[in-house]
């Protein structure tokens, strides 16, 4: 019995490299059961394909795939709706109110004053996430080419069963759960 589990390990996004990296692929065995654990990058470039042969072999031998979030949940409007709900301050809260002046000035220098004012209802973790994703996209990485999307599409085409380790709510809680003093470091 073989499974391929895709999970974000370490950095949530790829960060370009000169040499082709060794895949983050581990094998755990007990008796007849074999589980392959693959660290997944959510954004890649076309040049990152084809996948390493060890990854392709693990996929070919997998009876099922386990993702961070089940593919059906990834397609749900609850993901973006829940994320936006968690990202907004409650009535009366604002980004200006929680950011130290020096941090706000750095953010304005980076984003522009109008963009910061337009983001005033958003919590710091969400601003950080958006800035990070924006820089990764500018570097040429593409979420449609991420390993998770790649294997979700292949599993669907190959009729391989899939499931998730966490729910959308779990992911949103992990992203938004840091205390405010940690969000504004």
Sequence positions of predicted segments:
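Bacterial N-terminal signal peptides that target proteins for export
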Residues: 1-3
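Structured, acidic catalytic/metal-binding patches in enzyme active sites
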Residues: 5, 13-18, 22-185
């Amino acid at each position: 019995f073989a499974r391929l589990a895709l999970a974000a390990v370490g950095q949530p996004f790829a960060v370009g490299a000169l040499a082709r990296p060794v895949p983050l692929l581990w094998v755990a065995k007990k008796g007849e059961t074999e589980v392959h654990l693959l660290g997944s990058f959510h954004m890649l470039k076309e040049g990152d394909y084809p996948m390493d042969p060890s990854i392709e072999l693990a996929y070919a031998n997998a009876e099922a795939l386990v993702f961070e979030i089940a593919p059906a949940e990834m397609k749900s409007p609850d993901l973006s709706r829940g994320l936006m709900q968690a990202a907004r301050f409650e009535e009366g809260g604002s980004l200006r109110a929680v950011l130290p002046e020096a941090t706000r000035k750095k953010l304005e220098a980076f984003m522009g004053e109008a963009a910061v004012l337009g983001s005033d209802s958003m919590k710091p973790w969400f601003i950080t996430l958006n800035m990070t994703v924006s820089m990764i996209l500018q570097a040429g990485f593409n979420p449609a080419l991420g390993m998770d999307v790649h294997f979700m599409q292949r599993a669907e085409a190959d009729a391989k069963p899939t499931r998730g380790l966490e729910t959308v709510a779990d992911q949103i809680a992990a992203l938004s759960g840091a205390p405010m003093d940690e969000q504004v470091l």
